[in-house]
Amino acid sequence: MSDPRLPAAFLQPGSSSFSDFLAVQAPDLLPGRRAVPQGHAGDLAPHGTTIVAATFPGGVVMAGDRRATMGNIIAQRDIEKVFPADEFSAVGIAGSAGLAVEMVRLFQTELEHYEKIEGSTLSMDGKANRLAALIRSNLGMAMQGLAVVPLFAGFDLASNQGRIFSYDVTGGRYEETAFHSVGSGSLFARGSLKKLYRDDLTAEQTVQAVVEALYDAADDDSATGGPDVTRRIFPVVQVMTADGGRRMPDADVATIADRVIAGRMTSPDGPTAPLTARPLEGA
């Protein structure tokens, strides 16, 4: 028996893509279908900044700082930029914060809708491709300064390993090896991880490495916020393994952040990479 409160389209079998369903039934609800005034609007909206992800044997870690900026103004000090996408994956946002959060919600619904319609979850590559399509639909706004550039990571049940995907504003999808970072402080975060990352790190060591990387990014990029010990605001950290994804409790992140800060009191530039000296030939 049909439900008179719902339009007929909601009761008919259809596409496993929720965004395809919206495109037919309510296209104005899709971010990329809205009319945008001409001109550059990038400085009119808060921007999320630095997201970092790194793999370890048995999983992957994603972390994001808590600062949002609007031009030279700190728009928010405790924004959350890392969200669970489904049970085994997470997405971190950089770019126009409002549009990015909306895209994450649509992506979460997209994955949930697919699972309900098909009775199974999308593969890791399938999830990455769905996110790429959503980013591509935002290209018009990106050309006017309202870009969304997320970082996607999760545990792949098929290959039994953590995987990381980055994107460009056109929806181009690129799988990354070992670690990656996006956002205004990403250059400094990646440079930090080049010195800190090892492929035999434990989950906790990987979390400390990404927190160190965010600290280094905040040290050189004014749009990235470091651990705020006065307000007790620390990065959001998601850990994904074969058991699923979980947000690391704030108290645990605070313990690691305090450890990082204590180390910086004696070594302001952070840990150093060990060098093995070899005698020069003929010396």
Curated annotation (Swiss-Prot):
Any one GO MF term held by the record is: threonine-type endopeptidase activity
Q: Give the record's pathway.
A: Protein degradation; proteasomal Pup-dependent pathway
UniProt keyword Protease present: yes
Gene3D superfamilies, per database record: Glutamine Phosphoribosylpyrophosphate, subunit 1, domain 1
> Where does it live in the cell?
Cytoplasm
GO biological process per UniProt: modification-dependent protein catabolic process; proteasomal protein catabolic process
Propeptide residues? Answer: 1-48
EC class, as a word, reads: hydrolase
Subunit architecture: The 20S proteasome core is composed of 14 alpha and 14 beta subunits that assemble into four stacked heptameric rings, resulting in a barrel-shaped structure. The two inner rings, each composed of seven catalytic beta subunits, are sandwiched by two outer rings, each composed of seven alpha subunits. The catalytic chamber with the active sites is on the inside of the barrel. Has a gated structure, the ends of the cylinder being occluded by the N-termini of the alpha-subunits. Is capped by the proteasome-associated ATPase, ARC.
| UniProt similarity note | Belongs to the peptidase T1B family.
Instruction: List, alphabetically, the NCBIfam families matched.
Output: 20S_bact_beta (TIGR03690)
Query: What is the protein's name according to its record?
Result: Proteasome subunit beta
Question: Which organism is the protein's source?
Answer: Nocardioides sp. (strain ATCC BAA-499 / JS614)
Taxonomically, what lineage is the organism? Answer: Bacteria, Bacillati, Actinomycetota, Actinomycetes, Propionibacteriales
The UniProt gene name for this protein comes to prcB
